[in-house]
Amino acid sequence: MSSVLRPALSLIVLMSLITGVAYPLVVTGVAQVAFPAQANGSLLYDEAGKVRGSALIAQSFTGDEWFQSRPSAGAFATVASGASNFAPSNPALATRVTEDAAKLANAAQGPVPLALLTTSGSGLDPHLSPEAIAWQAGRVAAARQLPLDKLQALIDASTQRPLIGPPVVNVLTLNMSLNQLPSAPRNAQL
């Protein structure tokens, strides 16, 4: 019996050490050397060195002086991330979308972009399309007393063009860029 049990237990201990200790330490070490910013959460810092968020996780922005992210089914909490899972036929989804559209309709002209009314699969997608950002530009320009062409130039500079997929704008980095402008309102804090 011990001739079978001993090698089996030895293998369990060895594989536990390899897969539970050695492999994670090697991967963490390689990540810290090769991709330190990404390995530490893609954190974004303001000019004072204070962490303002992650480039990978959306945040809620309120106030006309900010570009707003798409809605979150989990109130932008990473622990409760995920979609609402409401079926298209669910009245609760229709009610939420109608209420959100009514709130946003006063902010700009034209129909509200779909990305500002629907949650992403994770509920934490930090990106919006340049069109959804441009739709909000008039409201932000008026609140910050900025010329619209200056704001559009900032949007263009913040637009990311991935190798695969459509162009996107990270809402947090765009809002952080707004605070770098000389006309940033004194009360506008992220």
UniProtKB/Swiss-Prot annotation:
<keyword id="KW-0406">Ion transport</keyword>
<dbReference type="GO" id="GO:0005524">
    <property type="term" value="F:ATP binding"/>
</dbReference>
<protein>
    <recommendedName>
        <fullName>Potassium-transporting ATPase KdpC subunit</fullName>
    </recommendedName>
</protein>
<keyword id="KW-0997">Cell inner membrane</keyword>
<comment type="similarity">
    <text>Belongs to the KdpC family.</text>
</comment>
<dbReference type="GO" id="GO:0008556">
    <property type="term" value="F:P-type potassium transmembrane transporter activity"/>
</dbReference>
<comment type="function">
    <text>Part of the high-affinity ATP-driven potassium transport (or Kdp) system, which catalyzes the hydrolysis of ATP coupled with the electrogenic transport of potassium into the cytoplasm. This subunit acts as a catalytic chaperone that increases the ATP-binding affinity of the ATP-hydrolyzing subunit KdpB by the formation of a transient KdpB/KdpC/ATP ternary complex.</text>
</comment>
<feature type="transmembrane region" description="Helical">
    <location>
        <begin position="11"/>
        <end position="31"/>
    </location>
</feature>
<dbReference type="Pfam" id="PF02669">
    <property type="entry name" value="KdpC"/>
</dbReference>
<keyword id="KW-1133">Transmembrane helix</keyword>
<keyword id="KW-0633">Potassium transport</keyword>
<keyword id="KW-0472">Membrane</keyword>
<keyword id="KW-0813">Transport</keyword>
<dbReference type="GO" id="GO:0005886">
    <property type="term" value="C:plasma membrane"/>
</dbReference>
<keyword id="KW-0547">Nucleotide-binding</keyword>
<comment type="subunit">
    <text>The system is composed of three essential subunits: KdpA, KdpB and KdpC.</text>
</comment>
<keyword id="KW-0812">Transmembrane</keyword>
<keyword id="KW-1003">Cell membrane</keyword>
<dbReference type="InterPro" id="IPR003820">
    <property type="entry name" value="KdpC"/>
</dbReference>
<keyword id="KW-0630">Potassium</keyword>
<keyword id="KW-0067">ATP-binding</keyword>
